[in-house]
Amino acid sequence: MAGNRCAARPGGPGVRARQCVERITSQVMDRRGALAIIVGMNTLSSAQSAPSTRSATSRTVGDLLREWRQRRRMSQLLLAAEADISTRHLSFVESGRAMPSREMVMHLAERLDVPLRARNALLVAAGYAPLFRERPLSDPQLSAAREAVELVLKGHEPYPALAVDRHWNIVATNNALGPLLSGASPDLLKPPVNALRLSLHPEGIASSIVNWHAWREHVLARLQRQIDVSADQTLSALRDELAAYPTPPGAQPPEPGESPLNQIAVPLRLRTPLGVLSFFSTTTVFGTPVDVTLSELAIEAFFPADPQTAAALHGLTDNRRSDGVHGATAGT
């Protein structure tokens, strides 16, 4: 592969990165149309779809509250104690013998740590209007939040970062992500681009992931934790889809040292034209959102897990800047 040929050249990681710039540029240009979609996502205003509509449901507010209580593995006695109400009253609410006030619905939802979208569903089931708005990211009232996300993404360069919605659909990226996706099928890079599908799909970057088995285990476990918290059926379907993907041809069997128990974090080790790059990721969310869209937005930032990865990405960025300066000089 091109990554192996580049990695075999003499010199330090930074030197190898500079030597590979022309090769990388050529490979990326071959997929300009597909990658332009990813690069274009660094504008949040057009990346988010319109607010979703609620489907009618016959479940009562008591049914929903009981489901959330059981999902949180709380007994009626424990929830009643934390909510400072009687167990009898909670039992009446769950059975439908008592209709909770708007304040009581919100009080119980807070104790159960129910997501904002589901809190709206609880209110509607109880006969009240939704409390939390769901605006598209293009809404002028979210301009400050948009700017904050764009600043975080841009400020993370030369390392890759992306913003995703609750279903892991990419809504924005920085410019460092595109070159890492040059091996993905253009069909998978058409909006909406799902980050998890892109990483594990046979036509995505799965064949480029060196530690595919460990990464797959990490992705599925993380997705399951989200499902346990949110009860999101779309995430459940996504998990089943990802779990059914075949092992990429040539994938190496997991090594004992790759066990998550032996690491501080599960890295993403990616085979690229620069050689094997290794990343660990962090997740950033809004601290006190009162908008459904913002409450479901997360930024995944990838950091270099070794000095070679850091040097390679810095070298690539330096050469891009140099090419830009030369191009501007030639145009004058």
PLM region spans:
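Conserved hydrophobic/aromatic packing and binding residues within compact polymer-binding modules
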Residues: 65, 79-80, 90-93
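A short, Lys/Arg-rich alpha-helix, primarily the initiator
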Residues: 29-72
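Recognition helix of helix-turn-helix/homeodomain-like DNA-binding domains
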Residues: 84-99, 107-109
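Short amphipathic recognition helices of helix-turn-helix/homeodomain-type DNA-binding modules
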Residues: 103-106, 110-142
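Hydrophobic protein-protein interaction segments
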Residues: 141, 150-160, 164, 171-328
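Alpha-helical residues within the helix-turn-helix
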Residues: 70, 81, 110
